[in-house]
Amino acid sequence: MKNRTSSKQGFTLVEIMIVVAIIGLLAAIAIPNFVRARTQSQKNACINNLRQIDSAVQTWALENKVAASATVSFGNISGYLKDAVVCPAGGTAFSDSYTLNGITNKPTCQKVSSSHILAPDTTT
């Protein structure tokens, strides 16, 4: 008689469960870091947009010899911006992303006002 040895190959249920648990643990560590990095990059991009807007406002005011108390609109500064600026944290247009606060005050972000703030000038 021939001896047949059963040579079943594959992973056991325990091995598969261990691999799934390890993948879950790695995901639990990686996902919050990814979300935090994404939020920080959106904040940095928004603050850069605020700098560009402020620079456009100041340039427009200087070139047109506008009084410091004058109001400014997006139509006034659109020619001074290379591209339309939108808050990366969920804005769809300039008007729902940013507020122009005159010439002497910095523009502000409407989307996440608590963290997307352009710091005042410290040079005097």
Task: Give short role names for the model-derived ranges.
Residues 1-11:
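N-terminal leader/signal peptides at the extreme start of proteins
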Residues 20, 47, 54:
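Conserved catalytic core of two-component sensor histidine kinases
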Residues 55-58, 62-124:
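Extracellular/periplasmic head regions of type IV pilus-like filament subunits
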